[in-house]
């Protein structure tokens, strides 16, 4: 069992009403937990990951260009190493995300091959069903969800999700912790909840950390479990009852560079783009909404972030 203070829950047990008080305290206090028994197994994760990794390693430049979107407000298809910068969005720097990725959603997808599409669509559907059920449990447990204010849960969870597979290669010397402490800047997700399935670094280094109770807590790989993180839409949907924990991906030190590569399969359960919220309330919940309007939509917010995220600087040589 991994050494972590973050609780582990089982979806079937939660469905049957077990651990309700512990679950409520966890989601309203931490906003992050591990989940087992959610319907996707190791075989599912491995097949989807291997399919993307084969494309990352063997796809030609022309093949990658064919599935790279030129629409900056969309997360679809291939995104090259260091093509994005979470730090630019969060205004914490200009360094790039040291990762490459492939993304898909409900529609507007681009795939390298029919087989890639088949594998990923089956994987997407399993994670979508699990995320919807989990989000329903999380929002209900919070005690802050009010259908008269937000609308029905069914409508909220009939969502606009995104699946993104990130590959974090071994870092070059100029991206080791001594030079740049993070592979990916601190941020909270623009989602209701997020599923994160990780593969461990071969050398044992733990990259993913979340801020819990004012301290950074490592989130190691737990066998047969995903990390579930409340995103920024969670406090907006529960009148602030749920937090949206900031998290980041650490860089290894120079002595831990070898064997530090890892993958992260991330499923963002996002509301539809017309989900509206009060900008003032969002700011009162600690969310950095940089929009000059009283009422904004999810589409307004995420569109601005995606444009800002695309790295303006050329990747550093190293």
UniProtKB/Swiss-Prot annotation:
Disulfide bonds: none annotated. GO terms for molecular function: deacetoxycephalosporin-C hydroxylase activity; L-ascorbic acid binding. Its EC number is 1.14.11.26. Pathway: Antibiotic biosynthesis; cephalosporin C biosynthesis. It is an enzyme of class 1 (oxidoreductase). Keywords: Antibiotic biosynthesis, Iron, Oxidoreductase, Vitamin C. Its cofactor is Fe cation. It holds the Pfam family 2OG-FeII_Oxy. InterPro entries: IPNS-like_FE2OG_OXY, IPNS-like_sf, Iron_ascorbate_oxido_reductase, Oxoglu/Fe-dep_dioxygenase_dom. One of its GO terms (biological process) is antibiotic biosynthetic process. Residues 158-271 form the Fe2OG dioxygenase domain. PROSITE patterns: FE2OG_OXY (PS51471). Hydroxylation of desacetoxicephalosporin C in 3'position to form deacetylcephalosporin C. Monomer. Belongs to the iron/ascorbate-dependent oxidoreductase family. This is Deacetoxycephalosporin C hydroxylase.
